[in-house]
Amino acid sequence: MTDPVGVSRISPEQVFKMFQVFGERRSGTNFASALLSKNTPLKEVSQFGWKHGIPSFPVFPKSCLFVVILRDPIDWLKALYRAPFEVAPGIQDLPFREFIRCEWESVYTPRKSGWRGHGYELDFSLGRGEILQLDRHPVEGRRYRNVLELRNVKLAGHLSLLSRSTNCVVVRYEDVNRDPEHLLSVVRDVFRIPVRDKALLLKQRVGPSSPKQNAITDLSAADMEHIKKHLDLAQELRCGYPL
């Protein structure tokens, strides 16, 4: 079994009641949530912040298991480009070479109660198209210089859960997708959370669908050079993604 990227277990005797998944768009967050919901007694929650955002909440309870799921940066870029989510219209229509080089902006998508369920109070009269502040730089408030800086900062934020005195496990989407029981084994063996003896595995896609707009298979040498120049390569290596 492949080891997880990281584990934080702060209270050996803790009884867990719930779990929340964090991870960037197109990284398998819905897959991980469905797997845990079907195979553990834990309640899935989203009240401790937007799962695609940087974790920030007054208190993270010890009774919650936080799960962070990551994805290979190249596969993630291709998936995000193929089906962008909450991305400003001017960006989602760009050719790939411009998509990875332009300043990033995300837009607010109204939901009946979704944002409130994430722990936020919002004016629900706001329409689609308002700036999504959770996808701006968390300190400087500016747009990210490009989607690669967005990944660097938000990945660092997700990994910070390992240092926030939380019960947390960080896994790679590739490992869980190849062997779904990988995550369940960690949950059982490390956190002593009961799982089904015979795991219920997912047979179809989970999560909301979105229009597939663009597809890209091969990256140009110039695009790869740009990606390597702007990604935090040390952080990617820590996560098991050498470039």
Enumerate the language-model features and the residues they cover.
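PAPS-dependent sulfotransferases, especially Golgi type II membrane carbohydrate sulfotransferases
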Residues: 1-23, 131-148, 155-166, 176-184, ...
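PAPS-dependent sulfotransferase catalytic domain
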Residues: 1-170
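Short acidic donor-binding/metal-coordinating loop in glycosyltransferase active sites
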Residues: 173
